Amino acid sequence: MISRSFLRLANPARRAMPAVKRVNMMPSMALPTKRLYHEKVLDHYSNPRNVGTLNKLDVDVGTGLVGAPACGDVMRLQIQVDDETGVIKDVKFKTFGCGSAIASSSYLTELVKGKTIEEAVKIKNTAIAKELSLPPVKLHCSMLAEDAIKSAVKDYRSKRSVKQPTLGPEAAQAETIAT
């Protein structure tokens, strides 16, 4: 005679989920999957640094706006540059996206503040990803941050070239003749 307890153990469906209430669910849903962010990502996501905006019309402010169509992340980064030294004296960001995108933006603002614009454009996404321990599936977030700083510097430089027009040879010659 076979005991009832043996039959319960012999039934593979009962062994698959002994501690979980048995409900009709797909096998792939039986074990919850959990993605954990690194503590640095959680810190920058929970307490983002330098969130806000600067006046985009100021000539010493450069604005970079970039996005990733694949995931929907949008990042705006603004830098305020000291005109005499070329040093980034303030930086602000607003990011609409996942925790990794927000953390990448926040970390980048800390990284570029106090650097020259030449130093800032040399920052690579790999440095951001390494510092935040981003998984490969989230590398695009650090790429957005790299693109944002390059775009902000480009905008700043374009404003500077408009602010300080240079005299062409004809204008300089006409000015000499007029005096």
From Swiss-Prot:
Listed Gene3D superfamilies: 3.90.1010.10
Record text on cofactor binding: Binds 1 [2Fe-2S] cluster per subunit.
Domain of life: Eukaryota
Residue numbers spanned by region Disordered: 160-179
Subcellular location: Mitochondrion matrix
Biochemical pathway: Cofactor biosynthesis; iron-sulfur cluster biosynthesis
First-listed, main subcellular location of the protein, grouped into a coarse class: mitochondrion
Keyword Transit peptide: yes
SUPFAM superfamilies on file: SufE/NifU
Cofactors (names): [2Fe-2S] cluster
Alphabetical list of CDD domains matching this protein: IscU_like
GO function terms (MF aspect): 2 iron, 2 sulfur cluster binding; iron ion binding
Keyword hit for Magnesium: no
Keyword terms of this UniProt record: 2Fe-2S, Iron, Iron-sulfur, Metal-binding, Mitochondrion, Transit peptide
NCBIfam families: iscU (TIGR01999)
Oligomer status and interactors: Component of the core Fe-S cluster (ISC) assembly machinery.
Task performed by this protein: Scaffold protein for the de novo synthesis of iron-sulfur (Fe-S) clusters within mitochondria, which is required for maturation of both mitochondrial and cytoplasmic [2Fe-2S] and [4Fe-4S] proteins. First, a [2Fe-2S] cluster is transiently assembled on the scaffold protein ISU1. In a second step, the cluster is released from ISU1, transferred to a glutaredoxin, followed by the formation of mitochondrial [2Fe-2S] proteins, the synthesis of [4Fe-4S] clusters and their target-specific insertion into the recipient apoproteins.
Identification of the protein by name: Iron sulfur cluster assembly protein 1, mitochondrial
Organism annotation: Debaryomyces hansenii (strain ATCC 36239 / CBS 767 / BCRC 21394 / JCM 1990 / NBRC 0083 / IGC 2968)
Lineage: Eukaryota, Fungi, Dikarya, Ascomycota, Saccharomycotina
